[in-house]
């Protein structure tokens, strides 16, 4: 069976178009249309699940940290009105993206704004100590980081244990930038 040149050209063009679309989906570009689409997403779809390639979650997963921070900022301004917990989470992630992008000074100021009241009466997560510990790492206050890490290490609950390990990792790699210290295997303590 002989294929016509037109058929081959059409197939080749479609293949290249699909490849270009896949590359664009994996790029760090964040257009006005992307920001507008993000603004229509629920908190879960934007921040937790990252249902489209241009949500802050998906941009962050691709290490597009500056764009992830911009997407978060735009979402906070133009997305749905969020409750206190949701605003805190999006703001926290925006600060993390800035820190991962190397802007630890701005990140520290943003993360400082994420302290909060307990989510509910049964909330045992000592979020504020985690915030203070992370802020201490970003501002290079070793003593405050150590105090926060020790406090979380003795607090009950899985969330506190996880966050204590993160702070211990930041302590172990205190001289490194956040991008190299946060959650990396080389910095994290062994699981008990």
Question: Across the structure, where does each feature detected by a protein language model lie?
Answer:
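Residue-level signature for tetratricopeptide repeat
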Residues: 58, 97-98, 135-138
């Amino acid at each position: 069976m002989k294929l016509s040149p037109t058929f081959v050209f059409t197939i080749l063009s479609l293949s290249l178009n699909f490849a270009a679309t896949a590359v664009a989906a994996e790029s760090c570009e964040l257009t006005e249309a992307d920001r507008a689409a993000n603004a229509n997403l629920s908190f879960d779809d934007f921040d937790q699940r990252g249902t489209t390639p241009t949500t802050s979650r998906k941009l962050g997963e691709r290490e597009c940290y500056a764009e992830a921070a911009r997407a978060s900022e735009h979402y906070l301004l133009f997305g749905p009105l969020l409750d206190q917990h949701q605003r805190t989470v999006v703001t926290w992630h925006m600060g993390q993206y800035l820190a991962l992008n190397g802007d630890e000074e701005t990140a520290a100021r943003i993360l400082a704004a994420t302290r909060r009241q307990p989510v509910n009466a049964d909330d045992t997560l000592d979020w504020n100590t985690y915030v203070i510990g992370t802020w201490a790492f970003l501002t290079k206050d070793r003593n405050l980081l150590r105090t926060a890490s020790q406090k979380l290490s003795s607090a009950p609950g899985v969330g506190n244990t996880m966050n204590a390990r993160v702070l211990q990792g930041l302590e172990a790699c205190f001289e490194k930038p956040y991008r190299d210290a946060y959650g990396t295997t080389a910095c994290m303590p062994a699981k008990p």
